Amino acid sequence: MRNALRLRYSLLPFLYTLFHRAHTAGETVARPLFLEFPTDPNTWAVDRQLLWGGGLLITPVLEAGQTKVSGYFPVGTWYSLAGDSTIHSKGQWVLLPAPLDTINVHVRAGHILPLQEPAFNTAQSRGKGMALVVALTPDGFARGDLFWDDGESWETFERGDYTEILFLASNVSTGTAGRGAPGQGVPVALGHLCLLG
């Protein structure tokens, strides 16, 4: 249970960014696989997995006592969020180990996820440094973004009191671009970079 809570708190910047996109652009936060992979008929009946955004695949255990779980991986490269395994899928089912203290979470190649060191609560988490998980494609490319405000005030986006950062990585270089109202952005400290691929 402790590891699940740590995972939840570490994913808050990514989830917060997804909710911002839902607010401003109508995107879905949690989505079925067929929404992201509509031409893959194998995804049409998958009802035991979900994506957060287009880049984070969650394969939970839904029955008590199970130590393994079967998950479908659409075509592409998928990295475990822990960085300890890689799945090069041609569109296939994979049997994953699922010990009690583990939630199977995989990052889709081509995505950059902002994370943060977990703490006792969300307010304390916000005081911790950010980390980036960079999941490179076989060609060496990834992109992601972060929307960050003070986490408490209303209408920070409308007032321009936020920081928005676009992260890009390629086999040649890495870079960021940011925006917010002049002099009002919320500071973001990057403390760690995890490169997958």
Residue ranges and their predicted role:
Residues 1-196:
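Catalytic core of carbohydrate-active enzymes
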